[in-house]
Amino acid sequence: MYVIVEINGQQFKAEQGKKLFVHHIQNAESGAVVEFDKVLLVDNNGEVTVGVPTVEGAKVVCEVLSPLVKGDKVLVFHKKRRKGYRKLNGHRQQFTEVSIKEVIA
């Protein structure tokens, strides 16, 4: 059984026991339990239920493993030819690692 759940504007395929890296969740502490109720699709052994826009009564219960994980560094380089203009910016996205404890559908 799996579900498609929307977390912080992104969609994830969630199964019990799976770990996910989601966009940073504010005020989340390690070991805290969080629930996500924006379940868009439920697949129960081939029986598919699609929400309009969400499935009523379905939710995903997760435990926060690590509240702040930094992603890989992305470098953005700007240059204008023949003018000597060069600019380098870097960015590291912040994530929260969660473990899916239970899928209620």
UniProtKB/Swiss-Prot annotation:
It comes from the Bacteria. GO terms for cellular component: cytoplasm; ribonucleoprotein complex; ribosome. The keyword rRNA-binding applies. Pfam families: Ribosomal_L21p. Keywords: Ribonucleoprotein, Ribosomal protein, RNA-binding, rRNA-binding. GO terms for biological process: translation. GO terms for molecular function: rRNA binding; structural constituent of ribosome. InterPro entries: bL21-like (IPR028909), bL21-like_sf (IPR036164), Ribosomal_bL21 (IPR001787). Belongs to the bacterial ribosomal protein bL21 family. HAMAP family: Ribosomal_bL21. This protein binds to 23S rRNA in the presence of protein L20. Part of the 50S ribosomal subunit. Contacts protein L20. This is Large ribosomal subunit protein bL21. It comes from Parabacteroides distasonis (strain ATCC 8503 / DSM 20701 / CIP 104284 / JCM 5825 / NCTC 11152).
